């Protein structure tokens, strides 16, 4: 297992295949994964298990009963960023270096609804967006997570990754 300062948070994920793919991506980039209930599937859903491949014994996975439980259960030294279409900043405009004293948490909303307004209102200054062409409503959740994981790795000179392929 690994200890990471980067945390991916899925708020009430709905699609098991997306979550399984995110398990695999978080493992590949050595990121912790937090799932906030309720889910739109069971954790043993065969589509999720298949999408996660052989990463289930390697992932740092945390489950939370609610948003409030997530906030209480995580470290006090944290910076929370919400991913949203209306964010003022893009991932390259925020500091993600692992030299920060805080753990980084990147929160992604539900595939169909995004994040609730109450959460968005509490983190107005910490909203980022992944730039895409305006004619497209959104990108797939699993792909959005990889965009953030890659930017984190890039800002840290890929120090969280192996430099050579297996």
From Swiss-Prot:
Subcellular location: Cytoplasm
Taxonomic superkingdom: Bacteria
InterPro entries, A to Z: Alpha/beta_knot_MTases, SpoU_MeTrfase, TrmL, tRNA_m1G_MTases_N
Substrates-to-products reaction catalysed: cytidine(34) in tRNA + S-adenosyl-L-methionine = 2'-O-methylcytidine(34) in tRNA + S-adenosyl-L-homocysteine + H(+); 5-carboxymethylaminomethyluridine(34) in tRNA(Leu) + S-adenosyl-L-methionine = 5-carboxymethylaminomethyl-2'-O-methyluridine(34) in tRNA(Leu) + S-adenosyl-L-homocysteine + H(+)
Pfam (any one): SpoU_methylase
Annotated Gene3D superfamilies: 3.40.1280.10
Gene Ontology biological process: wobble position ribose methylation
Molecular function GO terms recorded: RNA binding; tRNA (5-carboxymethylaminomethyluridine(34)-2'-O)-methyltransferase activity; tRNA (cytidine(34)-2'-O)-methyltransferase activity
Residues that bind S-adenosyl-L-methionine: 83, 109, 130, 138
Keywords assigned: Cytoplasm, Methyltransferase, S-adenosyl-L-methionine, Transferase, tRNA processing
EC number annotated for this UniProt entry: 2.1.1.207
Residues of the signal peptide: none
First-listed, main subcellular location of the protein, grouped into a coarse class: cytoplasm
NCBIfam families, A to Z: tRNA_yibK_trmL (TIGR00185)
Family to which the UniProt record says this protein belongs: Belongs to the class IV-like SAM-binding methyltransferase superfamily. RNA methyltransferase TrmH family. TrmL subfamily.
Protein name: Putative tRNA (cytidine(34)-2'-O)-methyltransferase
């Amino acid at each position: 297992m690994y200890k990471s300062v980067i945390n991916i948070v899925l708020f009430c994920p709905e699609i098991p295949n997306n979550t399984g793919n995110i398990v695999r991506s978080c493992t590949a980039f050595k990121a912790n994964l937090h799932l906030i209930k309720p889910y739109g599937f069971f954790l043993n859903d065969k589509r999720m298990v298949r999408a996660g491949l052989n990463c289930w014994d390697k992932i740092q996975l945390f489950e939370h009963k609610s948003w409030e439980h997530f906030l209480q259960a995580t470290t006090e030294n944290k910076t929370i960023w919400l991913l949203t279409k209306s964010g003022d900043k893009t991932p390259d405009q925020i500091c993600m270096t692992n030299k920060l004293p805080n753990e980084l948490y990147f929160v992604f909303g539900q595939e169909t609804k995004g994040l609730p307004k109450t959460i968005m209102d509490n983190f107005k200054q910490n909203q980022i967006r992944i730039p895409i062409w305006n004619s497209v409503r959104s990108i797939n959740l699993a792909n959005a997570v990889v965009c953030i994981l890659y930017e984190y790795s890039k800002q840290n000179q890929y120090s969280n990754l192996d430099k050579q392929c297996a």
